[in-house]
Amino acid sequence: MEKLRLLGLRYQEYVTRHPAATAQLETAVRGLSYLLAGRFADSHELSELVYSASNLLVLLNDGILRKELRKKLPMSLSQQRLLTWLSVLECVEVFMEMGATKVWGEVGRWLVIALIQLAKAVLRMFLLIWFKAGLQTSPPIVPLDREIQAQSRDGDHSSGSQEQSYVGKRSNRVVRTLQNTPSLHSRHWGAPQQREELGVAPTPLGLQETIAESLHIARPLLHLLSLGLWGQRSWTPWLLSGVVDVTSLSLLSDRKGLTRRERLELRRRTILLLYYLLRSPFYDRFSEAKILFLLQLLADHVPGIGLVTRPLMDYLPNWQKIYFYSWG
C-alpha cells in the first residue's frame, strides 16, 4: 500500500509539473483506441475499453490540476461528487453496454442500459432540484485546457499584476501588451478573447425552464419505457422521444441571461436532433440505403476520400446498433 501511495504522489507531481506532456499522453491513449478498432476479433470492445480509459484519465488528471491550481468548482463537495459520478458513467457507458452484450446477451445489455440511464437520471434530477445546478451540460465537468493553464501559471510568475491587454483610445480595440504576448507557436492570431471563467455560477431556472430540463432528463427513461411497451420496430418510441426533445428545446427558447457554456449546450442539443436520422426505425427504413449509397459514390469518384468513407461504411452499422452511441 505504501508503494502505491508513493506511486500516486509521484504521478500527481508529474501531472502538475508537465500538463502539456500529460495532454499528449491522453491523446496517445485515445489515438490507440482508433488504431485498434476493426483490427481483430473483439477489437471493438478493446478499442472502446481503451477509449473509456482515456476519458477517465482526462477526468483524473483534471482533478489533480484543479487541486494544484486551486481552481475549485463553484459548488459544494456533494455536488462535485455527483458530477464526478455522472462523468464516470458517461465515460464507461458504451463499454459497459458492449461488455454486457458479450457476456449476458440482449437481456443483460438492456438491463445494463436501463440501470445506467436510471442512475444518470437520478443524479441529474438531484443536481437540478436539490442543488439548483441549472442546465445540465455535456460533459458534466468541463475539461481543463492544459495549454492555457500552463500559460496562466507562467504568466502568474512573470507578469504579476501587469495588465494583460489595453484598449485603444480611438479604435476601442483590445490589444495584448508585449509582455503578455504568447510564443509564436502557441499564439492565436485573432483578437484576444475575454474568456468566460469556468467558475461562473449557473443561471437560475424558472418554473418553465425547470420543466424543460426535467423533460430533457426524463427523455431517455421515457424512450426505454416505450421500447418495452411497443418494441424496437415501432415508430412510437422514436416519435415520443423526438416530441419530448423538441418540447424541451422550445421551452428553453429564451436564451437571454444564459452563460456562454449554457448557450453552447442548447446549440449542441439542437444539432443532436439530426441524430434522429440515424436512429431506428427511421434509419432502417429511409436513411441507411441513402447514406451508404452516398458514401460509396464518394469513395468511387473522389480520389483519396475512400480511405475515410469505406471504413465509415463498415463501422456505421455497428455504431448504429449501440444504444449509447445513437440514443445516449
Curated annotation (Swiss-Prot):
Domain of life assignment: Eukaryota
Span list, region Interaction with PEX19: 213-328
Stretches of the chain found on the membrane's Cytoplasmic side: 1-84, 132-328
One GO term (biological process): protein targeting to peroxisome
Species of origin: Bos taurus (Bovine)
Span list, region Disordered: 149-169
Bilayer topology term: Multi-pass membrane protein
Presence of the UniProt keyword Membrane in the record: yes
InterPro entries (alphabetical): Pex16
Ranges facing Peroxisomal side: 106-110
Keywords assigned by UniProt, alphabetized: Membrane, Peroxisome, Peroxisome biogenesis, Transmembrane, Transmembrane helix
Organism phylogeny: Eukaryota, Metazoa, Chordata, Craniata, Vertebrata
Protein name: Peroxisomal membrane protein PEX16
Location(s) in or outside the cell: Peroxisome membrane
Parts of the chain that traverse the membrane: 85-105, 111-131
UniProt record similarity statement: Belongs to the peroxin-16 family.
Chain positions covered by the region annotation Required for peroxisomal location: 66-81
Oligomer and partners: Interacts with PEX19.
First-listed, main subcellular location of the protein, grouped into a coarse class: membrane
Gene Ontology CC annotations of this record: endoplasmic reticulum membrane; peroxisomal membrane; peroxisome
